[in-house]
Each structure stands twice: as structure tokens, then as C-alpha cells.
């Protein structure tokens, strides 16, 4: 599992990705790549 600090970092990254998305799908693609690269991160969402 992730530590509280790791969860905070991931949540912060997710907010950045979601904020940058603006409905264009870029954020979602980045998130999918991010989770693919680190499957354990998927548990955070």
C-alpha cells in the first residue's frame, strides 16, 4: 500500500492532470499511462 505522503503526492498529481484535461482527454490518457506504469497507484483512486 501507499503511505499517507505518497497518497498526497498522487492526489496532487491527479488534480494537476484533471485540471489540465479541460475535457480534451489529455488528462485521462496521462492518468492511464501513469497507472499503467505504476499499477499500485490505481488503488488510490
From Swiss-Prot:
Keywords: Heme, Iron, Metal-binding, Oxygen transport, Transport
Keyword S-adenosyl-L-methionine listed: no
One annotated GO molecular function: oxygen carrier activity
Positions of the Globin domain: 1-45
Gene3D superfamilies recorded: Globins
Keyword Membrane: no
Superkingdom per UniProt: Eukaryota
Misc remark: The sequence of this fragment differs from the corresponding region of the major monomeric component at 9 of the 42 known positions.
Subunit note: Monomer.
Similarity comment text for this entry: Belongs to the globin family.
Protein known as: Globin, minor monomeric component
Species, as recorded: Glycera dibranchiata (Bloodworm)
Amino acid at each position: 500500500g501507499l503511505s499517507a505522503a505518497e497518497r498526497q503526492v498522487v492526489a496532487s498529481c491527479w488534480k494537476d492532470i484533471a485540471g489540465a484535461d479541460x475535457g480534451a482527454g489529455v488528462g485521462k490518457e496521462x492518468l492511464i499511462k501513469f497507472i499503467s506504469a505504476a499499477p499500485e497507484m490505481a488503488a488510490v483512486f
